[in-house]
Design a protein with these regions (language model features):
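Hydrophobic face of alpha-helices
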Residues: 20, 24, 116-123, 216
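A generic structural signal for alpha-helix starts
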Residues: 18, 110-113, 210
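A conserved active-site cap/scaffold subdomain adjacent to cofactor or substrate pockets
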Residues: 95-146
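TRNA-binding/sensing appendages of the translation machinery
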Residues: 1-51, 256
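Short glycine-/small-residue-rich flexible loop motifs, especially phosphate/cofactor-binding loops
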Residues: 24-25, 69, 138
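A translation/RNA-centric and nucleic-acid-associated enzymatic feature enriched
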Residues: 38-72, 81-108, 143-280
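Short secondary-structure capping/junction motifs at helix and strand boundaries
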Residues: 32-35, 78-83, 129-130
Length: 280
């Protein structure tokens, strides 16, 4: 075979290794413990905008370690992180791959504003310090009331591409886009943020919802949307809900696309420039 060589240059792969070490050192210095969550589990998420990869007879490759990390927190684990693979069906392109590296961490006692500062601190360590701007979702796409969700998603994606150069935190998402974030006191927006750097979406964080009944209701809404879109039905993760009923402590969490950050550090144009091999 002639295509045995890695996709990325050896220099990019060495740089990637250095960035992985720096990220781990940053979190260790703040007493955030590294955990390892299985990549394959019986259940996955119900979120209609994210599709899981099924492994027949075994379950699903995990789109994120979120549910199992929150189970650890409910069991008494202190602030923790995972830096490892995540998987999503149907994602392929310059900025997407079915398998990618995700850095996800949870901070006990934090809200989303405190976590935004920590995300900025980490990015400054890896990418060099620069100023950040804060915009609301409405600043980015305009009024959302009465607009179809698919139209809003397209408008948001296009608007993010235009946020360049620079670093932008986007906050105050509409309540119906809360995912698993809590709702702000205004009742109209969610305690959720996204980080966009030079037009690329990098991280997505929440002040975490704690109420098990509200989670179940949101999962029910997800299932209804899945049915309307003709998507596969996804069973609710009852072990996750049981952990919430036991009690998830006050916390905020964020998921960061590590490959994209490596891309930005190395001046690369595509994920294939900073990953050794592509599995599919």
């Amino acid at each position: 075979m002639s295509n045995w060589r890695p996709l990325a240059s050896i220099e990019h792969l060495k740089q990637r290794a250095e960035l992985l070490a720096q990220a781990r050192a940053f979190l260790a210095a703040r007493d955030v413990i590294e955990v390892q969550i299985p990549a394959l589990a019986k259940d996955s998420i119900t979120e209609p905008d994210v599709q899981s990869i099924e492994v027949p007879g075994y379950g699903y490759l995990q789109t994120s370690p979120e549910y199992q990390m929150k189970r650890l927190l409910a069991a008494g684990m202190p602030s923790c992180y995972q830096l490892g693979p995540a998987f999503r069906h149907g994602e392929q392109g310059m900025l997407h791959n079915p398998e990618f590296t995700m850095l996800e961490w949870y901070r006990l006692g934090f809200d989303h504003n405190q976590l935004m500062y920590e995300v900025a601190d980490l990015v400054d360590v890896l990418l060099g310090p620069k100023p950040y701007q804060r915009l609301t979702y409405e600043d980015v796409v305009g009024k959302s009331k009465g607009r179809r969700r698919d139209a809003l998603d397209l408008a948001f994606a296009k608007a993010c591409e235009r946020l360049t150069p620079g670093r932008f935190f986007i906050t105050d998402y509409p309540a119906d886009q809360a995912a698993l974030a809590r709702i702000n006191p205004d009742g109209q927006t969610a305690a959720r943020f996204e980080l966009v750097i030079d037009g690329i979406e990098i991280a997505n964080g929440y002040w975490e919802l704690l109420d098990a009944d509200e989670h179940r209701q949101r999962f029910k809404t997800d299932s209804e949307i899945r049915q309307q879109r003709g998507l596969p039905a996804m069973a609710v993760d009852e072990a996750f809900l049981a952990a919430l009923e036991h009690g998830l402590p006050e916390c905020a969490g964020v998921a960061l696309g590590f490959d994209r950050l490596v891309m930005l550090v190395g001046g690369a144009k595509a994920l294939s420039d900073v990953t050794a091999f592509r599995g599919s």
